[in-house]
């Protein structure tokens, strides 16, 4: 379970909520797994080059990257989209470059055991606005 922090990157958080409501993230595959560093998903083609249409404007977040931080994957400024990653450890070189979307609040041990090709389903938790 990861908690989206809309105050940190409000435009990105809004886009992610809309994609979740539309069902975009149903059965998404982790296409990139680097043990001890990061797992990445959000590409419906599962190869790392796809995503939702369009791109998101970059938002700076000074939040540090620690175990379980969820960040926006980028290929450069204003290139964010539906791909996101979760880090396994302290990664200070990502802070201020990749917007932070939230943190894993439950199941970090599961996150640490994810293998390439494992899938996830993102949905709104009960009690969240629909």
Per-region residue spans from a language model:
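Cyclophilin-like peptidyl-prolyl cis-trans isomerases
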Residues: 1-130
